[in-house]
């Protein structure tokens, strides 16, 4: 593959909007870390067993699936617990990325997109050839997060603060996609970024 795009940004900045556009309009293969992270904690998985052992049955719903809201309350208010959880999940996500990239390489796809919200924090920048950061203001992040997840101001703030500041991610980007304006503006930036020579 000539291009492996690492698509990242802060929570609520618009990564899904960009990845959906790249998949549906540009027909690019999109591999999503969040999808793999959900698979990692499916009922019966070693990771879910470790989570239940550490935090008790309260993090499981009656059908033995993960109670995401309860786990979120624990890890987003305690950086040490969040790090522990990430240490359980990130190796699985990395292995899935590597396996999928191998399969796509065999199919000779020229460009692949990896959606990795914690690209920098999880140390996965070595998997990509360029980094696209979807950016918007912290105020916009807060508003989107509160509306989408129905979180309180304090809960939204805690989730945003759990990630590397968006300004730092922006400074490390190959390409910055500014999502503080209209969808049309964002789409134009994505189209232009795809035409930009590989980094």
Task: Please name every model-derived segment.
Residues 13:
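ATP-binding Walker
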Residues 28-41:
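Short beta-strand-centered segment that lines the nucleotide-binding/catalytic pocket of NTP-utilizing
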Residues 38-110:
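ATP-dependent small-molecule kinase phosphotransfer cores
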Residues 98-106, 111-147:
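ATP-dependent NMP and nucleoside kinases share a basic, alpha-helical "lid"
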């Amino acid at each position: 593959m000539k291009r492996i795009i690492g698509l990242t940004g802060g929570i609520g900045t618009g990564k899904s909007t960009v990845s959906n556009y790249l998949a549906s309009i540009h027909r690019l293969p999109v591999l999503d870390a969040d999808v793999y992270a959900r698979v990692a904690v499916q009922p019966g998985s070693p990771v879910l067993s470790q989570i239940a052992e550490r935090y008790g049955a309260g993090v499981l719903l009656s059908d033995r699936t993960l109670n995401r809201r309860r786990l979120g309350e624990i890890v987003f208010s305690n950086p040490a617990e969040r790090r522990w959880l990430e240490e359980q999940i990130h190796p699985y996500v990395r292995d899935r990325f590597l396996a999928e990239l191998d399969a796509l390489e065999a199919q000779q796809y020229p460009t692949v997109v990896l959606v990795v919200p914690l690209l920098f924090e999880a140390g996965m920048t070595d998997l990509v050839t360029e980094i696209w950061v979807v950016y918007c203001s912290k105020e916009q992040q807060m508003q989107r997060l509160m509306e989408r997840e129905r979180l309180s101001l304090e809960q939204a703030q805690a989730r945003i603060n759990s990630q590397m500041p968006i300004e730092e991610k922006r400074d490390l980007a190959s390409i910055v996609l500014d999502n503080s304006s209209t969808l049309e503006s964002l789409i134009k930036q994505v189209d232009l970024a795809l035409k930009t020579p590989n980094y």
